[in-house]
Amino acid sequence: MGTFTYERQVYLADTDGAGVVYFNQFLQMCHEAYESWLSSEHLSLQNIISVGDFALPLVHASIDFFAPAHCGDRLLVNLTITQASAHRFCCDYEISQAESAQLLARAQTHHVCIALPERKKAPLPQPWQTAICDLDHP
């Protein structure tokens, strides 16, 4: 299975009063990794928004936490695609410390392609299917 890796530093704004990454920021980092992967595949979320013939709503998100991260930490977000079909796909994420490889969190997001304006399930456009297949089956 192929993996896309996104590296990110933890900033002070990512942390809470206890000095650790606030829980929702881990999901934000996952979405940053997703957008970075799309960019590497020349797939534009802005193009989806401006053309407006389909959308990829996130219909489920889950995350499990194993260890904290702190301001200044370098993190790796590894993204793999699972459970891909003609109209949906799941992104699995593992967030770890860049230096020690300690696993901090695992997350998953489910995305479904819908036609607009009907908002009915639709097949993913071919460029998306190709990119997903490339990451799902290297």
Curated annotation (Swiss-Prot):
One of its GO terms (molecular function) is fatty acyl-CoA hydrolase activity. Keywords: Hydrolase. CDD domains: 4HBT. It catalyses: 1,4-dihydroxy-2-naphthoyl-CoA + H2O = 1,4-dihydroxy-2-naphthoate + CoA + H(+). One of its GO terms (biological process) is phylloquinone biosynthetic process. Pfam families: 4HBT_2. PROSITE patterns: 4HBCOA_THIOESTERASE. The keyword Hydrolase applies. This is 1,4-dihydroxy-2-naphthoyl-CoA hydrolase. It comes from Synechocystis sp. (strain ATCC 27184 / PCC 6803 / Kazusa). The lineage of its organism: Bacteria, Bacillati, Cyanobacteriota, Cyanophyceae, Synechococcales.
